Amino acid sequence: MKAMILSAGRGLRLMPVTKNTPKPLVKVGKQTLLERNITLLYQSGITEIIVNGSWLGEQIESFISNIQLEGLKLHYLYEGSEPLGTAGAIYNAMDCNLLLNENFWLVNSDIITDFSLPNISLLNNRVGHLILVPNPEHNPNGDFGLRSDQVLNESVEMLTFSGISFLSCRMFDETTERSSSLVDIFRDKINHNLISGELFLGEWLDVGTVKRLNRAHNTFGKN
């Protein structure tokens, strides 16, 4: 099974921490965010991981070149000085034949979680499965609703997208703009009842700002 870690973001909300360090290589405790997510995927049985990069991408490339985990293949895709966006990154991986006609896990590089990847089958022509979490302080209105295992664009009770999803390459066809945001693509597919999901209640933190990075140090800094 393959996975991709989205790692090309500029990390402006983490300045000045990210002035000379790309966001995925920011450390929480003894480990970088990227290392934590590679370990998470590897321990869940992932055997091939694609990591994209842009800002200070040479540091990311050097970092993953030194990771040695038995049975794991790591690929680095440099996107140039301007990131391709969340959907563009996936199209780029498909163009490079690193993602073919298959299903794969997609993880944001700036989250910390103890989520364990389940075995998922995309049934009834669905093209994606989203992991949702209770709304954190910084996103009180949530992103999506959930009825049974069906993700909704609107609901009385909204939840937050965790940055973890299980996707089919069928989601990214010729009808979709490469410059689209991944969330916009999700919303379109949700309108056609093509996205399932589940609620995760374990440890999860989006390390997107200096304030939340400090919280991560307090919560996860010992490991």
PLM feature spans:
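N-terminal glycine-rich phosphate-binding loop and ensuing alpha1 helix
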Residues: 1-60
